[in-house]
């Protein structure tokens, strides 16, 4: 809640006196939340986000823009995004009624423009993202996804949601053959390289089998 202060000054002849400082608060009528349907992620997962915008005032807001950083973070000298917007997955509701899809730029960042929120009503934007190769999977890793709502004469609203990496083994296997080429009736040697890209060891009880 924003606060403001105000002070008066009284001059009478050569005398000057200041009043007390009056403090007021501005009640923002527009609020928003961001929620992930699933609070954890794994390799090649899909994560669905729900943005809820509530207008508690008597005036509608039009022309709002939602900008989502898709979890962007600094890597080396650049910036990478661990989530990729899945085209065509935007659903936009006003007071629970599905609307025509707004204008979407996949980014990154993801930009959704042309959002309206009626007086004493709400708007909901739902969309899906795919976990990509820049997502961290080590134990304790997470993706912090931040969105910003601007336009329509409002004070910008920033909202975020954090999802955690699943503690699970993620196995990849590569097969190679030697020698290449091989003479007729020669002997071949096959080599399997198994890598665990996950955040937990693959124990014997996991039951990994090569066929």
Regions found by a protein language model. Give the residues of each.
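Exported/extracytosolic protein signature
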Residues: 1-211
């Amino acid at each position: 809640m924003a606060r403001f202060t105000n002070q008066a000054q009284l001059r009478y002849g050569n005398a000057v006196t200041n009043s007390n400082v009056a403090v007021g608060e501005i009640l923002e009528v527009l609020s928003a939340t961001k929620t992930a349907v699933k609070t954890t992620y794994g390799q090649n997962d899909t994560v669905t986000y729900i943005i809820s915008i509530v207008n508690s005032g008597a005036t509608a807001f039009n022309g709002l823009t939602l900008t989502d950083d898709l979890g962007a973070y600094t890597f080396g000298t650049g910036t990478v995004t661990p989530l990729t917007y899945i085209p065509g997955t935007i659903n936009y509701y006003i007071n629970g009624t599905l609307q025509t899809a707004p204008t979407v730029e996949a980014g990154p960042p993801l930009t959704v423009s042309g959002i309206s929120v009626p007086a004493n009503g709400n708007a909901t934007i739902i969309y899906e993202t795919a976990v990509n190769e820049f997502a961290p999977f080590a134990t304790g890793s997470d993706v912090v996804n931040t969105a910003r709502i601007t336009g329509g004469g409002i004070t910008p609203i920033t909202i975020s949601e954090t999802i955690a990496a699943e503690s699970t083994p993620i196995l990849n296997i590569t097969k190679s053959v030697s020698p290449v080429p091989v003479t007729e009736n020669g002997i071949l040697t096959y080599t399997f390289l198994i890598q665990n890209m996950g955040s937990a060891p693959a124990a014997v009880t996991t039951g990994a089998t090569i066929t």
